[in-house]
Amino acid sequence: MIDTALIIFIALTGGLLLGGLVSGLDRILTARFQSRIGPPLWQPFYDLAKLWSKEKTVVNVWQAFCAYCYVAATSIALVLFVLRSDLLLILFIQAVGAIFLVVGALSSTSPFSQVGAHRELLQILSYEPLLILVTIGIFLETGNFKIAGIYSWNEPLIMRLPFLFVVLGYALTVKLRKSPFDLSTSHHAHQELVKGLLTDYSGPILALTEIGHWYEVVLILGFCSLFWATNWIGMIVLVGVTYFFEVLIDNVSARLNWRWMLGYVWALGLSLSLVNLIWLYVG
């Protein structure tokens, strides 16, 4: 019992620290791509502390409730991943958290929040089927939905699931709202959206959504690590290279509209998934 409590504490604090560092590294890489110096690595933590120091102001109580539910869902999903629980359960919990964030935005009458929320729903509809297909592929290869069993597999999954890893990269780009799929909100506010999904979040409540996002980043990178679980070096290299390409694509891509997003993600994602699943079945 004490060991489990310690693991939960390490998962929450470590996830917060790692998520903030990844966010800081994202900013530094983005600055380098744009020939800028960029902020220090710890800047996301300074921003988070500044948000916590602000006055707590919400549009309505439901908005704050949804923000708490969002960060609770993402933290629970991360803890379950660290405890090596069931992968399907983790995907379901993170999806519930994403829906709560949308519901919180819909509770506002701001047109920017409304548009951002509807676009976020479309993004959820685009990446969730892909995550499920990737999970099915992992199960067909390992015969296990348990993360403990997947990590104990005797060869890197990417060797047998290369197309599904590409599909996971697509889902990762949409999930993290990176260009060209930053339709609902982004770190760089768009003219017609302002801040979109997060327009009416501010102060400590906005800080909660940022913490939830950090947990999501760590969770989805943990998902990527399943594809090279045979040794730590390969796992770290795979995750690092994957996130580097996510940042690179974010900086060289123009934003698509939702029709292009659904067309590209579903057409390419479902096609690659089908090819890889047939390969597994035949092989």
Give the ranges of each region predicted by the language model.
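Alpha-helical transmembrane segments of multi-pass membrane proteins predominantly involved
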Residues: 1-283
